[in-house]
C-alpha cells in the first residue's frame, strides 16, 4: 500500500468514537498510574467491513471483500509509553492488510504501528528506511521509518514521521510490550527521544485496503 493511502483513512479514524470507562490503579516503573479499560473505538469505514464490537467486553470482529480503505479496532485515548496490550483471536487476509497496535503522537506529530500479523509488509515499501530491529515478546521485529510530506493526519494536512515494527513470527494472540518498541524507536528519533511522549489514541486494530479477509479479536491492556 502507498504510505499516503494509509494516512488518508487514519486521519478519519482519529475522529473515532471515545467514551471513558472505569479504571483501576497500577504501578509501573515506580510511578502510580491508571490502568484503563477500553475507552476508545476506532471506526473508519467499518460499515464496509462488517465491523461489530462490544466496547465493554473489549471484543470486535470484521469481515471484508475488496473493501475501500478501513481501519477498525479498540483501545485507549490517550495512549501511554508503558502499556502492555494483550490480544487474542483470529485474523486471515489474502492481501493488503495488517493486524497491529496502531497510534499517534501529538507532538512531534507521529504515526506508529507494531505489526503482529499481516499480508502486506510496510517495510517492503520503496519509501521506507529499515533502521534496525528489536527483540520483544518472543520474536524479532524489523524496524523501519518513513516521512510523510503534506499528507492528511490527525491534525490536518501535515508533514510527519511514521514508525513501524514488523514481527518476524506472525501471530494472532499474545502481549505487545510497547515500551520495548518505543525505546528502540527513540534511537532513531521517535518522539525526539522524550521520556514521556505526547500520545494521542492507541489501539489494537485491523486495517485493510483490498483483498478478502476476516478478524475477530479480544483486546485488553
From Swiss-Prot:
Catalytic site: 111 (nucleophile), 207 (proton donor)
Highest taxon above the source species: Eukaryota
A Gene Ontology molecular function term of the record: endo-1,4-beta-xylanase activity
Keyword Hydrolase carried by entry: yes
Disruption phenotype: Reduces the rate of xylan degradation and growth on minimal medium with xylan.
Pathway(s) this gene product operates in, as recorded in its UniProt entry: Glycan degradation; xylan degradation
InterPro entries assigned: ConA-like_dom_sf (IPR013320), GH11/12 (IPR013319), GH11_AS_1 (IPR018208), GH11_dom (IPR033123), Glyco_hydro_11 (IPR001137)
Pfam families on file: Glyco_hydro_11
Induction summary: Induced in presence of Zea mays leaves and by xylan, and repressed by glucose. SNF1 acts as a positive regulator through the release of glucose repression.
Subcellular location: Secreted
One of the protein's GO biological processes: xylan catabolic process
Record's function text: Endo-1,4-beta-xylanase involved in the hydrolysis of xylan, a major structural heterogeneous polysaccharide found in plant biomass representing the second most abundant polysaccharide in the biosphere, after cellulose.
Membership in a protein family: Belongs to the glycosyl hydrolase 11 (cellulase G) family.
Protein's name in the database: Endo-1,4-beta-xylanase 11A
Lineage of origin: Eukaryota, Fungi, Dikarya, Basidiomycota, Ustilaginomycotina
Amino acid at each position: 500500500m502507498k504510505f499516503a493511502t494509509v494516512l488518508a483513512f487514519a486521519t478519519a479514524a482519529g475522529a473515532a468514537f471515545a467514551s471513558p470507562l472505569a479504571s483501576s490503579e497500577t504501578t509501573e516503573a515506580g510511578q502510580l498510574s491508571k490502568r484503563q479499560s477500553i475507552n476508545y473505538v476506532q471506526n473508519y469505514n467499518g460499515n464496509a467491513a462488517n465491523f461489530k464490537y462490544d466496547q465493554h467486553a473489549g471484543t470486535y470482529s470484521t469481515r471484508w471483500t475488496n473493501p475501500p480503505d478501513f481501519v477498525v479496532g479498540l483501545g485507549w485515548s490517550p495512549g501511554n509509553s508503558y502499556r502492555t496490550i494483550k490480544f487474542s483471536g483470529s485474523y486471515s487476509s489474502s492481501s493488503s492488510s495488517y493486524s497491529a497496535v496502531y497510534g499517534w503522537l501529538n507532538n512531534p506529530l507521529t504515526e506508529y504501528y507494531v505489526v503482529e500479523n499481516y499480508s502486506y509488509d510496510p517495510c517492503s515499501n520503496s519509501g521506507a528506511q529499515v533502521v534496525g530491529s528489536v527483540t520483544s515478546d518472543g520474536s524479532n521485529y524489523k524496524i523501519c521509518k518513513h516521512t510523510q510530506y503534506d499528507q492528511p493526519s490527525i491534525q490536518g494536512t501535515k508533514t510527519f514521521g511514521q514508525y513501524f515494527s514488523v514481527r518476524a513470527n506472525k501471530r494472532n494472540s499474545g502481549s505487545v510490550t510497547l515500551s520495548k518498541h518505543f525505546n528502540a524507536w527513540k534511537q532513531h528519533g521517535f518522539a525526539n527521544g522524550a521520556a514521556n511522549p505526547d500520545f494521542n489514541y492507541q489501539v489494537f486494530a485491523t486495517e485493510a485496503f483490498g483483498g478478502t479477509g476476516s478478524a475477530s479479536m479480544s483486546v485488553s491492556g
